[in-house]
């Protein structure tokens, strides 16, 4: 055993043994039945159980002290006959919440006890719910190779002088309770003391011993213990209970940690928090297989607690004799824990029906009955998480072919406690989302670079948009980016500098003068000389900037609006209007646009041009226009209004005026 002194080595060895578990449908662990009796794991299980027994025994002793202080008793009798022994009692106190040891065979007729669930009860109910102290584990192990009985004690203890249950100790209370109990299924409608016998032989079946589970001070109300079966392993989360025809027997709460390996060596389950034990008959290894009845699930109710639990029925492959069909049956069911408040409210109802109201959910008509000729090997199923609106699954096994009794009416419905589901951690953004976010930020930065800049157009070199006056460069009638309009030889920017356009390329002055391109340079359209400096192109021709001037005022028109006549003479706008603008027929002056405008406003009448201010009546000076009373009535090439025109006609118009028409 020295190799297990190291706690790390011990834990590592035990974790290696967990590879015998296989995945279940509900995500928990299922025991590999093929490896349950492997002898190479016996030493590991024994050492691990011994270690855990010491830890749990300390916790149970503390719980026992607290219960004894809260429940002072007038008289005490020896606990369970006072026949308790060292390590065996420690292991029994831990129950099946720890990996069980390979237990020795117990001779027929002798009863041994194992531990079951210890629920926490309120102080006022502790008097009627004593918890058994540590008992020795032991049963008939079908698959064990150990022979003689290692430890045994009488199944029945003598009753103490005090018959009041309030003054009995844990063991004596259940012993007296078992002696006063009738046989299961005989008279289910009698007093609540019909709960099954514990620690005593099955009535009418001598030679068979009944195994029971006693709770040993486990303070957690929902942390159950495991019972053990011959050569079988339990799946975590299922319990077993016993009941008569229509009498209801409470079932315990069963669960086990997923990291524990269970090797079950007992042939039947026993008492859990006062639940009567299931007797053992002849050893008939009937493997349990699930049979889908009523579409794989049957609904069972508790007549006292109003609890509904859907479950599936397990039936053995081996049929029993017909005379056993009316006998006791053995069931396995999953019972969900009720809250302490619900248990208090329903305590009176549960006691009237012969139930322990603190055991949670009890099923009516499905509580197991013992079969005197069959040994049922229950399989624990993994417990599913309970929600506010779901009932826990219920699994049951039938050791005979007897029909399941009908449901009993429920006086009330009990709402189960809701288990809050914690949401998993939120996943971070995916790779695609990160790329999309980066692209969006890039586009936003590019848009922010030109928030409200003016758009000039597309660059002829890179075909991209030109935003803002700082990037725009116009040359040879085309639009460039400032960075795109560069010398073809040295790549220097040519904005604001002299450049030369040769054979479709632009060069700076230095590269043009020292490269021999002057032989093919453009000539000025006006002077005819080579353009060695800056070039100015207008109207499809090349000019020196100094040669491009107005023919009237000789002003340089580089960068200034200009116009040409039909002979391609260049004028500034002012001189163009002076020379080529139409003349007013009244005053003889050219009609020029007003100051600050390039548009000319004139009046055309009788195929003549007039200033707006010159178009009026020559006699009275009335401004003429298209309005009524202001219309023009010309006479002998003179402008008159209608009244002046009539006066002129009355004086005797000349023959030429007869042909005048009104305009």
Swiss-Prot record:
- What SMART domains has UniProt attached to this entry? LIM
Post-translational changes noted in the entry: Phosphorylated during mitosis.
Q: Where is the stretch described as Interaction with RB1? A: 391-429
- Alphabetical list of CDD domains matching this protein: LIM1_Ajuba_like, LIM2_Ajuba_like, LIM3_Ajuba_like
Where are stretches of biased composition, namely Polar residues? 138-153, 230-239, 267-296, 335-351, 364-376
Presence of the UniProt keyword Hydrolase in the record: no
- Residues of the region (Mediates nuclear export) are 54-128
Q: Where is this region: Disordered?
A: 74-99, 117-158, 230-253, 267-297, 335-416
Gene3D superfamilies hit by this protein: Cysteine Rich Protein
Respond yes or no to whether keyword Cell cycle is given for this record: no
Q: Where is this region: Necessary for nuclear localization?
A: 459-663
What keywords would UniProt list here? Cell junction, Cytoplasm, LIM domain, Metal-binding, Nucleus, Phosphoprotein, Repeat, Repressor, RNA-mediated gene silencing, Transcription, Transcription regulation, Tumor suppressor, Zinc
Q: Where is the LIM zinc-binding domain?
A: 457-518, 522-582, 583-651
The UniProt entry's GO biological process terms, in alphabetical order, are:
cell migration; cytoskeleton organization; miRNA-mediated gene silencing by inhibition of translation; miRNA-mediated post-transcriptional gene silencing; negative regulation of canonical Wnt signaling pathway; negative regulation of DNA-templated transcription; negative regulation of hippo signaling; negative regulation of osteoblast differentiation
Pfam families per the UniProt record, alphabetical? LIM (PF00412)
Its main localization is: cytoplasm
Q: List-wise, which residues carry Phosphoserine?
A: 139, 227, 233, 268, 291, 303-304, 408
**Membrane spanning segments where?**
none
InterPro entries in alphabetical order: Ajuba-like, Ajuba-like_LIM1, Ajuba-like_LIM2, Ajuba-like_LIM3, Znf_LIM
GO molecular function annotation: metal ion binding; transcription corepressor activity
Origin superkingdom: Eukaryota
Query: Quaternary structure?
Result: Interacts with SQSTM1 and RB1. Interacts with EIF4E, AGO1, AGO2, DCP2, DDX6, LATS1, LATS2, EGLN1/PHD2, EGLN2/PHD1 and EGLN3/PHD3. Interacts (via LIM zinc-binding 2) with VHL. Found in a complex composed of LIMD1, VHL, EGLN1/PHD2, ELOB and CUL2. Found in a complex with TRAF6, PRKCZ and SQSTM1. Interacts (via LIM domains) with TRAF6. Interacts (via LIM domains) with SNAI1 (via SNAG domain), SNAI2/SLUG (via SNAG domain) and SCRT1 (via SNAG domain).
Q: Which family does it belong to?
A: Belongs to the zyxin/ajuba family.
Function noted in UniProt: Adapter or scaffold protein which participates in the assembly of numerous protein complexes and is involved in several cellular processes such as cell fate determination, cytoskeletal organization, repression of gene transcription, cell-cell adhesion, cell differentiation, proliferation and migration. Positively regulates microRNA (miRNA)-mediated gene silencing and is essential for P-body formation and integrity. Acts as a hypoxic regulator by bridging an association between the prolyl hydroxylases and VHL enabling efficient degradation of HIF1A.
The name this protein goes by in its record:
LIM domain-containing protein 1
Organism in which the protein naturally occurs: Rattus norvegicus
């Amino acid at each position: 055993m020295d190799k297990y002194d190291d706690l790390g080595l011990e834990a590592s060895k035990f974790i290696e043994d967990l590879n015998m578990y296989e995945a279940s449908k509900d995500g928990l662990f299922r025991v590999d039945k093929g490896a349950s009796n492997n002898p190479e794991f016996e030493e590991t299980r024994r050492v691990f159980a011994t270690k855990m027994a010491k830890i749990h025994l300390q916790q149970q002793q503390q719980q026992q002290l607290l219960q004894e202080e809260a429940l002072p008793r007038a008289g005490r009798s020896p606990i369970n006959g006072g026949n308790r022994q060292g390590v065996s009692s420690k292991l029994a106190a831990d129950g099946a919440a720890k990996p069980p040891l390979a237990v020795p065979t117990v001779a027929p007729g002798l009863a041994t006890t194992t531990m079951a669930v210890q629920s926490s009860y309120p102080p006022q109910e502790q008097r009627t719910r004593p918890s058994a102290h540590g008992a020795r584990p032991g049963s008939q192990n079908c698959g064990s190779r150990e022979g003689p009985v290692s430890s045994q004690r009488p199944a029945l203890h003598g009753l103490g002088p005090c018959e009041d249950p309030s003054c009995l100790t844990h063991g004596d209370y259940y012993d007296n309770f078992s002696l006063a109990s009738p046989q299961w299924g005989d008279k289910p409608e009698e007093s609540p003391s019909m709960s099954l016998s514990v620690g005593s032989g099955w009535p009418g079946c001598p030679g068979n011993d009944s195994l029971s589970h006693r709770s040993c001070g486990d303070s957690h109300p929902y942390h159950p213990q495991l019972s053990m079966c011959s050569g079988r392993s339990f799946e975590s989360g299922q319990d077993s209970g016993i009941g008569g025809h229509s009498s209801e027997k409470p079932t315990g709460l069963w669960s086990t940690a997923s990291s524990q390996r269970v090797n079950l060596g007992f042939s039947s389950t026993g008492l859990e928090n006062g639940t009567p034990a299931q007797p053992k008959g002849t050893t008939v290894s009937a493997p349990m297989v699930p049979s889908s009845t009523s579409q794989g699930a049957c609904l069972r109710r508790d007549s006292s607690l109003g609890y509904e639990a859907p479950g599936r029925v397990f039936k053995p492959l081996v049929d029993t004799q017909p005379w056993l069909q009316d006998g006791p049956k053995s069931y396995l069911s999953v019972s969900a824990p009720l809250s302490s408040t619900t248990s208090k409210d329903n305590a009176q109802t549960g006691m009237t029906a012969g139930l322990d109201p603190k055991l949670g959910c009890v099923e009516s008509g499905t509580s197991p009955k013992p079969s005197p000729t069959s040994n049922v090997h229950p399989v624990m199923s993994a417990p599913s998480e309970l929600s506010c609106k779901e009932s826990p699954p219920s699994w049951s096994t039938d050791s005979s072919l007897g029909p399941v009794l009908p449901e009993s009416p429920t006086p009330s419905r009990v709402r189960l406690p809701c288990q809050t589901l914690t949401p998993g951690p939120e996943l971070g953004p995916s790779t695609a989302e990160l790329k999309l976010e980066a692209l969006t930020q890039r586009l936003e930065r590019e848009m922010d670079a030109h928030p409200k800049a003016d758009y000039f157009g597309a660059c002829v070199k890179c075909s991209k948009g030109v935003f803002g006056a700082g990037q725009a460069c116009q040359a040879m009638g085309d639009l460039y980016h400032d960075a795109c309009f560069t010398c073809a030889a040295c790549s220097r920017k040519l904005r604001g500098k002299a450049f030369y356009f040769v054979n479709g390329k632009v060069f700076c002055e230095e590269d043009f003068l020292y490269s021999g391109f002057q032989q093919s340079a453009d000539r000025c359209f006006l002077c005819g000389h080579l353009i060695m400096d800056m070039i100015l192109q207008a109207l499809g021709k090349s000019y020196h900037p100094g040669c491009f001037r107005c023919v009237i005022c000789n002003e340089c028109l580089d960068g200034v609006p200009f116009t040409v006549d039909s002979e391609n003479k260049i004028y500034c706008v002012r001189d163009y209007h002076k020379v080529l603008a139409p003349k007013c027929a009244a005053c003889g002056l050219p009609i020029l646009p007003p100051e600050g405008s390039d548009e000319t406003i004139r009046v055309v009448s009788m195929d003549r041009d007039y200033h707006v201010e010159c178009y009026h009546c020559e006699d009275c000076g009335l401004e003429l226009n298209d309005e009524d009373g202001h219309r023009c009535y010309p006479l002998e090439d003179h402008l008159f209004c209608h009244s002046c025109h009539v006066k002129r006609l009355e004086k005797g118009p000349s023959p030429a005026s007869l042909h005048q028409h009104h305009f």
